[in-house]
Regions:
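Collagenous Gly-X-Y triple-helix signature in extracellular proteins
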Residues: 1-239
């Protein structure tokens, strides 16, 4: 996504300052618009996900108080909405089998907890799985319904969703937790898929002690605003 800011606003000054003073390896993506264009975006009718279509373009709005962490992105205040323009997702093609392609988003698109609370969970019962796929509360330990507010419905059109294959995920046991296989359209890579001979076939290195550029990805500006650290940080796997 690209952040959209009003020309001459404090948000423009803030994001320019971040772009100048933050980690030089991270390119902050923003677009400055005039007052007429910004008013159209600001006054649009946003749904429960915070999304709206304005003149054929999809936008997401977010306030600082709705972010999971505020330590990294420099919010001028916590109650003013910021606006993010959706962009086509850039994919890494990990493998192709016939007419099926295994895809990984090239950049972290959002920032979410693996589970909403500190409960001992596995992939099958985590809230991140429900949020990614739009499952109801019966599928996670928090009983939280994600059938309306989720990732898959926001990131993909109905036509695109029909093209995504539901795959059986062979989940590795984690410590003392026995994992069942799951059937999901969207999922996190497993440990085996990022560190093993299989990972090498996907283009990743197999030695975590050696810097591997393929394991590196820069978060989108929206994920940054939600709380993602854009310097050195790790990510969760499904296992």
């Amino acid at each position: 996504q690209t952040e959209v800011v009003l020309e001459g606003s404090k948000e423009e000054a803030s994001i320019k300052q971040m772009a100048e003073n933050y980690d030089p390896t991270y390119k902050i993506s923003y677009e400055v618009v005039d007052s007429a264009a910004f008013e159209d975006i600001q006054n649009a009718s946003y749904d429960d996900n915070g999304d709206a279509i304005v003149n054929g373009t999809k936008y997401r709005r977010l306030k600082g108080e709705d972010a999971l962490f505020m330590e990294f992105y420099k919010w001028p205040d916590t109650t003013t909405y910021h606006y993010y323009k959706y962009q086509p997702i850039k994919w890494r093609v990990l493998s192709v089998n016939g007419n099926e392609a295994f895809l990984l988003a090239d950049a972290p698109l959002d920032f979410q907890f693996y589970n909403l609370t500190g409960k001992d969970v596995i992939w099958e019962t985590s809230t991140i799985r429900s949020w990614l796929n739009g499952y109801d509360g019966e599928c996670n330990v928090e009983n939280k319904d994600y059938s309306n507010q989720n990732f898959i419905n926001c990131a993909f059109s109905g036509e695109e969703q029909t093209a995504i294959i539901t795959k059986e995920i062979e989940n590795e046991d984690y410590w003392h937790n026995k994992q069942n296989n799951t059937a999901d359209k969207v999922f996190l890579l497993s440990r085996e898929e990022v560190q093993s001979d299989k990972a090498v076939s996907y283009g990743f290195g197999n030695d975590l002690d050696v810097h591997d550029e393929a394991h590196r990805a820069q978060a989108t500006i929206y994920a940054f605003a939600m709380g993602a650290c854009v310097s050195n940080n790790g990510t969760f796997t499904s296992s």
